[in-house]
């Protein structure tokens, strides 16, 4: 076994030696690493029960034993870093996407400085590297509510311990600026920052309600451009106009619903469930791709919720501009409910979503969290999976 592990380690190191840089923070090389990685007592090895072969046209997943939700992964030299939901944003390291993964600490030194939502365990981190510094964008909120905020922390190193929490960038529901369009009708969570070839940075965000939006950032990457002076240039990226399920408010006996200044409900959407979230922008010449998760992410203890076809799946649209419009194969705008499904439930892979794109010398990798239905449908058992991507006529196709 020791010989096998050594061989695996050497092969992994060789394969990761040539990584092309990406402004999106998806793959990096030649960056100093102040936190050397060694497997230890917190190491999580490859999945003991790998997902079974697909039976729905989708390939099986490369499954791992890393329990995670909404992962953000970058590669620095020969080491992969994963940032995910957990106390103060949990960081794991590995020499291979397959693992073994080791928890090495937290990104923040304590609670987020933003006084909203779940400050102890910020959601949906998105980490990028640019201009010699790492930036981790995160969100704080409460489930089912859009009284949310997006913050950012930065560091000269990707590991734990040396991050500065810059705090609030943008917020919805309540607080300064939340009455500005489109913040008065959107949900400021699931941040994703994309830096275009000309150096312009865009913050993509949104979950449920009116869907996914984009706003430009200032050059220092910690301030939204135009928010303070009334010149905010927001673009609507994607939406689910249909009512996929009834709102819980429809059966509520509550006399009042908490609302923002504009009258838009803060907790619960009386128009129904519009399950679109987790936007992630990537570039593969000559197109920009807007990836997102559609459907229900969690709460599958009820068997009926597992069989109605409304669980998470990964969709995409493309454009010739980072500002859109993004369309699917049929030419339907994502704002009008379009979206090409690239990966969904198959075999023991259930409800894949919370995705991102990682680029290495062999091409693009679609990574995500999913539930292994042969193990558990519990939220806490979501784990990291991934697939390679091929492009056919400019459209991404998941392969094993």
From Swiss-Prot:
GO terms for molecular function: arabinan endo-1,5-alpha-L-arabinosidase activity. Pathway: Glycan metabolism; L-arabinan degradation. This is Arabinan endo-1,5-alpha-L-arabinosidase B. InterPro entries: GH43_arabinanases, Glyco_hydro_43, Glyco_hydro_43_endo_a_Ara-ase, Glyco_hydro_beta-prop_sf. GO terms for cellular component: extracellular region. One of its GO terms (biological process) is pectin catabolic process. It comes from Emericella nidulans (strain FGSC A4 / ATCC 38163 / CBS 112.46 / NRRL 194 / M139). Pfam families: Glyco_hydro_43 (PF04616). The lineage of its organism: Eukaryota, Fungi, Dikarya, Ascomycota, Pezizomycotina. Glycans are attached at residues 24, 184, 372. Endo-1,5-alpha-L-arabinanase involved in degradation of pectin. Its preferred substrate is linear 1,5-alpha-L-arabinan. Keywords: Carbohydrate metabolism, Glycoprotein, Glycosidase, Hydrolase, Polysaccharide degradation, Secreted, Signal, Xylan degradation.
